[in-house]
Amino acid sequence: MFEYQVSGENMLESILKNTSEIVSIEEMNELLKKEGEKIAYIGFEPSGKIHLGHYLQIKKMIDLQKAGFKIIILLADLHAYLNQKGTMEEIRALGEENKKAFESMGLIADYVYGSEFQLNEEYTIDVYKLALATTLNRAKRSMEVIAREDENPKVASVVYPLMQVNDIKHLNVDVAVGGMEQRKIHMLSREILPNMGYKAPICIHNPILTGLDGEGKMSSSKGNLIAVDDDEVTIKNKLKNAFCPMKEVFGNPVLEIARYYLDYPVNINRPEKYGGNLVLNNYGELETAYIEGLHPMDVKTLVAEQLIEILNPIREKIK
């Protein structure tokens, strides 16, 4: 466990940083005042490549750990199986690789495979109870963002959200963390778990990083990612070719990485004929400079240099 590095309002501010929303901030503030163990969890379907999108989630778990939370990482092997990600053996092997990557990022956590408890009798009965308490339309809506690419969804896509809600109960979770694509499932858990005699979880939703091609989210299946174990040449080449439209911020993956990963202030070194050297004290200044005409290649070079510095130690530990 990390020693506390923040306290009081600073602790809440650290947890809020770089999140899309917390439901609710008032509940989080009250939880931070309480004594005793507090549990925060996030679930990951084992994935072939751990990338910056995953790392953004892990950074938030580290923030929570520094605030005194016990961290549980659910390696959701049964969820991945229901989502047609491979055989259980293949998924478990990926889970072990993912665990090593998360540990290499500096996260100290309890790692739990879903199959370790999701096949138990009590868990199964609770899934049935949730099925009785949830309308079919409500369950389908909760999976819309997660399964939107599936043209012919299976019945499993309705079971999936019920299991995820049940995970929160059976892992004794106080705070559920995920990307914005998890919001509908988390809201379902807040709505339905109190009716089963369990507390409503506080929910932290993090941004979804745009893929390097500018089309949809950063994803292992699409290959539009920077993996945490990419080498220096690969990182430079990927950023060189990344979608980064001049003066446009919205949906710009390079600017998103600059927002969530760069350590400010930053220096951009340029010849005098191109405006000379530039010092940017925060992301807001970088965004303003970009809108005013800072060249995409200057930003790409800056982001590549800092990402290499951040990811090199992680890559070395993963080897």
From Swiss-Prot:
<comment type="subunit">
    <text>Homodimer.</text>
</comment>
<dbReference type="GO" id="GO:0005737">
    <property type="term" value="C:cytoplasm"/>
</dbReference>
<feature type="binding site">
    <location>
        <position position="182"/>
    </location>
    <ligand>
        <name>L-tyrosine</name>
    </ligand>
</feature>
<feature type="short sequence motif" description="'HIGH' region">
    <location>
        <begin position="46"/>
        <end position="54"/>
    </location>
</feature>
<dbReference type="InterPro" id="IPR023684">
    <property type="entry name" value="Tyr-tRNA-ligase_3"/>
</dbReference>
<dbReference type="InterPro" id="IPR001412">
    <property type="entry name" value="aa-tRNA-synth_I_CS"/>
</dbReference>
<feature type="binding site">
    <location>
        <position position="220"/>
    </location>
    <ligand>
        <name>ATP</name>
    </ligand>
</feature>
<dbReference type="InterPro" id="IPR050489">
    <property type="entry name" value="Tyr-tRNA_synthase"/>
</dbReference>
<feature type="short sequence motif" description="'KMSKS' region">
    <location>
        <begin position="217"/>
        <end position="221"/>
    </location>
</feature>
<dbReference type="GO" id="GO:0005524">
    <property type="term" value="F:ATP binding"/>
</dbReference>
<keyword id="KW-0436">Ligase</keyword>
<dbReference type="InterPro" id="IPR002305">
    <property type="entry name" value="aa-tRNA-synth_Ic"/>
</dbReference>
<keyword id="KW-0963">Cytoplasm</keyword>
<keyword id="KW-0030">Aminoacyl-tRNA synthetase</keyword>
<feature type="binding site">
    <location>
        <position position="160"/>
    </location>
    <ligand>
        <name>L-tyrosine</name>
    </ligand>
</feature>
<dbReference type="InterPro" id="IPR014729">
    <property type="entry name" value="Rossmann-like_a/b/a_fold"/>
</dbReference>
<dbReference type="Pfam" id="PF00579">
    <property type="entry name" value="tRNA-synt_1b"/>
</dbReference>
<dbReference type="GO" id="GO:0004831">
    <property type="term" value="F:tyrosine-tRNA ligase activity"/>
</dbReference>
<keyword id="KW-0648">Protein biosynthesis</keyword>
<comment type="function">
    <text>Catalyzes the attachment of tyrosine to tRNA(Tyr) in a two-step reaction: tyrosine is first activated by ATP to form Tyr-AMP and then transferred to the acceptor end of tRNA(Tyr).</text>
</comment>
<feature type="binding site">
    <location>
        <position position="167"/>
    </location>
    <ligand>
        <name>L-tyrosine</name>
    </ligand>
</feature>
<dbReference type="GO" id="GO:0006437">
    <property type="term" value="P:tyrosyl-tRNA aminoacylation"/>
</dbReference>
<dbReference type="InterPro" id="IPR023617">
    <property type="entry name" value="Tyr-tRNA-ligase_arc/euk-type"/>
</dbReference>
<protein>
    <recommendedName>
        <fullName>Tyrosine--tRNA ligase</fullName>
        <ecNumber>6.1.1.1</ecNumber>
    </recommendedName>
</protein>
<feature type="binding site">
    <location>
        <position position="164"/>
    </location>
    <ligand>
        <name>L-tyrosine</name>
    </ligand>
</feature>
<dbReference type="InterPro" id="IPR002307">
    <property type="entry name" value="Tyr-tRNA-ligase"/>
</dbReference>
<feature type="binding site">
    <location>
        <position position="41"/>
    </location>
    <ligand>
        <name>L-tyrosine</name>
    </ligand>
</feature>
<keyword id="KW-0547">Nucleotide-binding</keyword>
<comment type="similarity">
    <text>Belongs to the class-I aminoacyl-tRNA synthetase family. TyrS type 3 subfamily.</text>
</comment>
<keyword id="KW-0067">ATP-binding</keyword>
